Amino acid sequence: FQAEDGIRDVERSRGLGDVYKRQIEIKSNFKTVPGLTVILIGEDPASKIYVKNKEKFSKEIGIDSKVIRYPENIEEKVVLETIIELNQNKIVSGILVQLPLPKHINKQKVIETILPEKDVDGFHPINVGNLSSGYDSKIPCTPQGCFLLLKEVEKNLSGKHAVVIGRSNLNGKPMAQLLLKENCTVTITHSKTKDLKSECNRADIIIAAVGKPQLVKGDWVKKNAIVIDVGINKTAKGIVGDVDFKEVSKIAKAITPVPGGVGPMTIACLLSNTVECFKSCLLYTSDAADEGLGVDLGGRRI
């Protein structure tokens, strides 16, 4: 976070540090470590960098991380078959299919093939439903990371007016759910919102996750607002976010830079979810054995 008192490296101290402690406890108690398998399809530069960072931080804290790489033209059925095999593999605690996918592969079908217990991204419909219903759930990593960063700056979010720019299933909607659970008044904006600037001007918290370079300007933000920039946009001047950092940083109480703001926290939350998936899989297999249940080809109970 870039705040009035300078940069605080919360993503490493509070994010990875906490995951490391839990991973050490698991290794001590179960004589094994959580396993994360990532499926990477194609040669998208941003995806390759992101996956490389996941591998690096996994190794740092002792999570067993593997990457399965496929070319851009891989058949959808091969990807689905791989996921089914990973569902049945007891060594694999968490499964992640790196997005975006090639157009010929059905994203929703891929997401729904992953066991909810192994869904580290929190995208499976069961996890989405649990989150929206207020039940325990795997929470999508980027919104979860944004939420934890928010709590570093503002412990009590109750009654705050939050504007979420973007309504995607991956970021905008789950972010809104997390804010609602904290008793924020939440406004979700999108491409059809008539006066986005005025909506932002009223906000105590702005979450920008729409993919438009430097959309949010300084005169959109009120004094001492908290601004979280999820956007990653490639421009002639380099990588920029959805927020004009130079302008907004002069006004906001706290703002995340791009790159280097939300990204590291997203990875920390991914690894945290991997640890939680390890625990879920232990409960799942234990319950299934107790009840005399088997599994189908997708790894689900029958």
Predicted regions, residues:
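Single conserved hydrophobic/aromatic residue that forms the stacking wall/gate
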Residues: 1-20, 284-302
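Short beta->alpha junction loops
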Residues: 42, 66-76, 191-193
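Glycine-rich phosphate/diphosphate-binding loop of Rossmann-like nucleotide-binding domains
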Residues: 46-55, 140-216, 220
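Short beta-strand elements in bilobed, periplasmic/extracellular small-molecule ligand-binding domains
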Residues: 58-72, 186
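Short, well-structured alpha-helical segments in soluble
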Residues: 78-89
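Anion-binding alpha/beta catalytic cores of soluble intermediary-metabolism enzymes, centered on
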Residues: 97-157, 175
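Rossmann-like adenosine-cofactor binding region
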Residues: 188-280
